[in-house]
């Protein structure tokens, strides 16, 4: 399957975790109040970061077609998911955007 080849070629799991680590460092420095609300009194060493899903997406914006790969990590604490990180990659493995949200 082409998606599986793409995932192997770009090592999407490692790439997504690396991007998450960079994102979270910036988030903590640039948005300390928001960071504190999301992570509250959680012991950071006990947070499980789980590779949750990856998908090939085709979106239509007016008449334009936009194809990309979405990779998601789920953050769990005491077995419960509390946040999600999503990275968007173009078809050449370049990071286009990323999102972090509380769930």
Regions found by a protein language model. Give the residues of each.
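Exposed beta-strand-loop-beta-strand "reactive/processing" segments of non-cytosolic proteins
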Residues: 42-87
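Generic structural hydrophobic/aromatic packing signal, biased to beta-strands
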Residues: 16, 71-73, 93
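Alpha-helical structural elements
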Residues: 1, 15-18, 30, 46, ...
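N-terminal trafficking/processing presequences and adjacent post-cleavage segments
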Residues: 1-39
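Glutamate identity and glutamate-enriched acidic tracts
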Residues: 2-4, 30-33, 65, 84-86, ...
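A short, surface-exposed interaction/processing loop segment used at functional sites
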Residues: 82-103
